[in-house]
Amino acid sequence: MKQEVFSGAVKLPYLTNYLVSNKIHRVLLVTGNNSYNKSSAESTLEPHLESFEVTQYSEFSHNPKIEDVIRGVHIFTRKRCEGIIAVGGGSVLDMAKLIKAYQVSPGDISSEVKENIVGSCDTKLIALPTTAGSGSEATQFAVVYIDQKKFSVSDEKLRPDLVFLISNFTHSTSAY
């Protein structure tokens, strides 16, 4: 899979074109509880998403738990989302990857995570990191906790399809 990477907010109009050209009308927007607003991502992205049906999912722990993933998958399915946009740090991007990985899962998601099983997931994933350093926007890995035990899911299909690196989004993050 070829990943497209753009730098700077000036490239954001491509986001709208990308969604339209991929026939994505309903989007699951995965964000941090506060970072989406504090980073200026919300005000920057809003004009580019106003012609789409957007469902925001931000009610999950900083270290994603399997229950959070299952809830996210249910929201994605119930709202009939066609694409995922992740705006946040490593945990947010991991959550979006996991929702992508298991949104078509017919089985027990916990068992599939433990066995590193990722089914067919052709849903487009767009990443806009608000932190520098996790590198999650460039990798095929995602971390989730099941019963306080850490599991890593790895599959090439989890690498975001499109990435926007916007330096202003990182200005509100802590130095640590």
Model-derived regions: residue spans:
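Structural motif
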Residues: 4, 26-28, 55, 82-85, ...
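Short Gly/Thr/Asp-enriched flexible loops that form oxyanion-binding sites at enzyme active sites
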Residues: 44-45, 73, 92-106, 138-141
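Glycine/serine-rich anion-binding loops at beta->alpha junctions
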Residues: 81-99, 130-136
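A glycine/threonine-rich phosphate-anchoring loop and its flanking beta-alpha core
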Residues: 104-176
